[in-house]
From Swiss-Prot:
The keyword Acetylation applies. This is SH3KBP1-binding protein 1. Residues 146-165, 609-704 are annotated as: Disordered. It comes from Mus musculus. Coiled coil: none annotated. The modification Phosphothreonine is found at residues 163, 693.
Length: 704
């Protein structure tokens, strides 16, 4: 039984250095000497044994410390030997305990150890960083001014927003936005105005949505990413974002670069200019909350689970809304739009024919296929095989149902009239299928059981899926991603795990385990193998992410690049080179020092704050200003009484030992000292605690 005692009743404040001290740390007993525990001044143990901290003793008289004994063992070993042996204890746990006990030398050594894997410049995959933009000011009136709303001399097809001002660009201050708390979103959750909510990319453009406005960046080969558009401030949080940066085969003069944002049932659409800037096209109403917003070519599509679909056609400038069955999934390929519904039907829309076949406000939505069990179609993926003849593509559709069944249906171009035929069925999930992807080489399905993933290898003959030998099971794994219950950690639409990537290439999942995580894991969608992990360079939580397939340079031999875009809670945006990560998959990195090797090197010196030893001298860099080195090999200074090198060093320098580069670097390290204002140089001390100082030597052309 532990008994509390005062400093008088407990361990005496003064005792012999060789006195044996018995400790009970978390139920495990340790015995050591007073000298071992108190050689570091102002530590937890020196305060404990001097009576400044009241003690708690167990039934045997041992001092009880309610800490982890497993972590305490390497700490006690360090106090005994001044050498660090982690003994399997994680570095962060060891650092936390060392800070608790106030063991400054050990804390500094562990902090240097952590610097091996941390850098404000990221790792080799870090490709760029965009700071938070200037936020638009809050408007004081709700009436917009008349702007350039005429398109080709005709009035705009829809009303202008009376709740939006003209494009303010970069007007306003960041502080004004952050000082004003945002109103609650339609979901009732609080909003953080400064964090990135959504990120999307298309070709060489990026759209980033904050709570009440969005910005667009354009990649230029010579100057990198440049801010191209900033929207006015909106009254409600942005919940959906879509970007179309290039429309193939578009008619001259039509909008080929557009960005759209949805909030509630309203959709706002802007046209972007290649040279920068943009203009509002209009505001469209779906009538029900928008749950999916995307472009198919130059057609803007909005859907809701209620069964309502809205389409804005860039040619006719017409907004059309139509009711179908409750929509539970969708996918698009080419000009085909497929809608999966709760009644088991898959509806087909050819958006390319909208201007030609629009009749009586009918979008010509036709039923393509109905599930044999009439289960709800909860996930859809369509794959168009390369054209092998003039007849067209072989259409392959994979879909998942609410009962966990995965089916593959195919339609040959020559049998379009007969409809798709059921090709394969997999009953491997016991929860509803939430995602599915049919690519050139793999079939991937994800169910609602903590993102359980099943994958198959797809066999093809002349580009078409084949039954010989058929699809074979490949992998089973989970992409665990916890969601926040209080709305923090970002918008759920901005934290989609994927899979990301072109269907004829390797695809990846992006895993964010906890809502406020600053680290993301990139994994192959086919096997679950880790490709890489990235951590925010500024330590802020990651609130949104996506993968961008970016066009290659015009230079000879260049190829498209794949980037991971991460939006942070502080409003910044970071970019990571996934192409390099994929190229290096499976290669063992040839790194520098290991943690064990670094600890061995640090045992030869002591670490102390540089500011305390250099006075008011400026530090060369934030990183190197943390610590300075002290000799620990002997009790005498490396420099003699007059500041001259020790005999071995003087002899080596007299003989010109070392390479030319080594001598240049040595002199360069001492050169900055010569530029400081002349001050009386203190006499070097022979104590252990003084840092090494550079030689005060006059340089001339023969110094090398």
């Amino acid at each position: 039984m532990a008994v509390a005692t005062t400093a008088v009743e407990g361990v005496p404040s003064r005792g012999a250095p060789g006195e044996v001290i018995h400790l009970n740390v978390g139920g495990k007993r340790f015995s050591t000497s007073r000298q071992t525990l108190t050689w570091i001044p102002d530590s937890f143990f020196s305060s404990l044994l001097s009576g400044r901290i009241s003690t708690l003793k167990d039934e045997t008289g041992a001092i009880f410390i309610d800490r982890d004994p497993t972590v305490f063992a390497p700490i006690l070993n360090f106090l005994r030997t001044k050498e660090l042996d982690p003994r399997g204890v994680h570095g962060s746990s060891l650092l936390h305990e060392a800070q608790f006990y106030g063991l400054t030398p050990l804390v500094r050594r562990l902090q240097v150890r952590e610097e091996l894997d941390r850098s404000s410049c990221g790792n080799v995959l870090f490709n760029g960083y965009l700071p938070p933009p200037v936020f638009p000011v809050k408007r004081r009136n709700r009436h917009s001014l008349v702007g350039p709303q005429q398109i080709g001399g005709r009035p705009a097809p829809v009303r202008r927003s009376n709740t939006m001002p003209p494009n303010l660009g970069n007007a306003g201050l960041l502080g004004r936005m952050l000082d004003e708390r945002a109103p609650p979103s339609p979901s009732g959750q609080p909003e953080e105005p400064g964090m990135v909510r959504l990120v999307c990319g298309h070709h060489n453009w990026i759209a980033v949505a904050y709570t009440h406005f969005l910005v667009c960046y354009r990649l230029k080969e010579a100057s990198g990413w440049q801010l191209a558009f900033s929207s006015p401030r909106l009254d409600w949080p942005i919940e959906r974002l879509a970007l179309a940066a290039r429309v193939l085969g578009g008619a001259p003069g039509e909008h080929d670069k557009m960005v759209a944002a949805a909030t509630g049932s309203e959709i706002l659409l802007w046209a972007l200019q290649a040279q920068g800037g943009g203009s509002e096209i209009g505001v469209f109403h779906l009538g029900v909350p928008v749950e999916a917003l995307f472009f198919v070519g130059n057609q803007l599509i909005a859907t809701s689970h209620t069964g309502r679909i809205g389409v804005w056609n860039a040619v006719t400038k017409h907004w059309q809304v139509q009711e179908v069955q409750p929509i539970t999934s969708y996918d698009a390929a080419g000009s085909f739009l497929l809608l999966g519904c709760s009644n088991g039907s898959i509806y087909y829309v050819d958006v390319q024919k909208f201007p030609l076949r629009m009749k009586d406000n009918d979008l010509l939505v036709s039923e393509l296929y109905r599930d044999p069990a009439e289960d709800g179609v909860t996930a859809l993926s369509v794959y168009l095989t390369p054209k092998t003849s003039d007849s067209g593509n072989w259409i392959e559709i994979a879909y998942g149902t609410s009962s966990g069944v995965v089916r593959v249906i195919v339609q040959h171009p020559e049998t379009v009239g007969s409809g798709p035929q059921l090709f394969q069925t997999f009953s491997v999930h016991r929860s509803p299928v939430t995602k599915i992807m049919l690519s050139e080489k793999h079939l991937i399905s994800v169910c609602a059981d903590n993102n359980h993933v099943r994958t198959w290898s797809v066999t093809r003959f002349r580009g078409m899926i084949s039954t010989q030998p058929g699809s074979t099971p490949l992998a089973s794994f989970k992409i665990l991603a916890l969601e926040s219950v209080d709305g923090l950690g970002g918008c759920s639409a901005g934290n989609d795990i994927g899979p990301y990537g072109e269907r004829d290439d390797q695809q990846v999942f992006i895993q964010k385990v906890v809502p406020n995580a600053s680290q993301l894991f990139v994994r192959l969608s086919s096997t679950g193998q880790r490709v890489c992990s990235v951590r925010s360079v500024d330590g802020s939580p990651t609130t949104a992410f996506t993968v961008l397939e970016c066009e290659g340079s015009r230079r000879l031999g260049s190829r498209p690049r794949r980037y991971l875009l991460t939006g942070q809670a502080n409003g910044s945006l970071a970019m990571w080179d996934l192409t390099t990560a994929m190229d290096g998959l499976g290669q063992t990195p040839a790194g520098g020092l290991t943690e064990e090797e670094l600890m061995d090197q640090l045992e030869q010196c002591e670490l102390s704050p540089l500011a305390s030893s250099r006075g008011s001298f400026p530090s060369p860099s934030p990183r190197t200003s943390l610590t300075s080195l002290h000799s620990a090999s002997s009790n005498t200074s490396l420099y003699g009484p007059r500041g001259s090198p020790s005999p071995p060093q003087a002899e080596a320098r007299r003989r010109g030992a070392g390479s030319f580069v080594d001598r240049c670097q040595e002199l360069a390290r001492g050169a900055p000292e010569l530029r400081w204002p002349p001050t009386p140089a203190p006499r070097p001390s022979t104590s252990l605690g003084n840092p090494l100082t550079a030689l005060k030597k006059t340089l001339n052309e023969t110094s090398f």
